[in-house]
Amino acid sequence: MKIGIIGAMEPEVAHLIAAMTNATSQTIAGIEFIAGTLAGKDVVVTRSGIGKVAASIATTLLIEKYTPDAVINTGSAGGFVDTLAIGDIVISSEVRHHDVDVTAFGYEIGQMAQQPAAFIPAAHLVEAANKAIAQLGEVKAIEGLICTGDSFICDPVRTQAMLKNFPTMAACEMEGAAIAQVCHQFGVPFVVIRSLSDNANNDSPVDFDSYIVKAGYHSALMVMLLLEQLK
């Protein structure tokens, strides 16, 4: 079994890379792919860069060049659930674009033309993530809707508008739905694992800078525990 792991920023993949053994590196189109062993599994870890286009490029290259059996997207996110604190984790129950609108042609808000309204993660990956939750200690984790768009959300007015469109949204970030859409296109199972770096409010820019390392570590820990559950 080979697992592809994608994070957007260095703090989101640094702990994973540091824990790998037998690591080898290859750079394609300016994106570094590091293959090796992590938690007893063959993995390929890459830092995609921020945003949906960067994530799509990295995911496509990862799938085409390394043919993983599954893809895990790890990293940070803004939180939309009052019961979660910075550092807590959201496991994707579904993933949607929050900045897509082709409703004029009969699609749902957030649904790209000729694509499903929501991208559903692989049940066995979600199950493995839920089994890993028990080992997280004080870190809380829930399943929930993760939404993606090419914006850092820190405006309360925009937050409320997003919640009107996606009332069950647990977290938002900038890569997950793009990665999920590419995986859907290629028929590769995926899951998104995100640790909260901020609460998508006026304090978010300061919180993000302060807590991105913490969020990256918690998300990486969750990924490693998930890998241990996979057979």
UniProtKB/Swiss-Prot annotation:
GO terms for cellular component: cytosol. InterPro entries: MTA_SAH_Nsdase, Nucleoside_phosphorylase_d, Nucleoside_phosphorylase_sf. Gene3D superfamilies: Nucleoside phosphorylase domain. GO terms for biological process: L-methionine salvage from methylthioadenosine; L-methionine salvage from S-adenosylmethionine; nucleoside catabolic process. It catalyses: S-adenosyl-L-homocysteine + H2O = S-(5-deoxy-D-ribos-5-yl)-L-homocysteine + adenine; S-methyl-5'-thioadenosine + H2O = 5-(methylsulfanyl)-D-ribose + adenine; 5'-deoxyadenosine + H2O = 5-deoxy-D-ribose + adenine. Substrate binds at residues 78, 153, 174-175. Its EC number is 3.2.2.9. Keywords: Amino-acid biosynthesis, Hydrolase, Methionine biosynthesis. It comes from the Bacteria. The active site is at residues 12, 198. GO terms for molecular function: adenosylhomocysteine nucleosidase activity; methylthioadenosine nucleosidase activity. Pathway: Amino-acid biosynthesis; L-methionine biosynthesis via salvage pathway; S-methyl-5-thio-alpha-D-ribose 1-phosphate from S-methyl-5'-thioadenosine (hydrolase route): step 1/2. Catalyzes the irreversible cleavage of the glycosidic bond in both 5'-methylthioadenosine (MTA) and S-adenosylhomocysteine (SAH/AdoHcy) to adenine and the corresponding thioribose, 5'-methylthioribose and S-ribosylhomocysteine, respectively. Also cleaves 5'-deoxyadenosine, a toxic by-product of radical S-adenosylmethionine (SAM) enzymes, into 5-deoxyribose and adenine. Belongs to the PNP/UDP phosphorylase family. MtnN subfamily. This is 5'-methylthioadenosine/S-adenosylhomocysteine nucleosidase. It comes from Shewanella sp. (strain W3-18-1). The gene is mtnN.
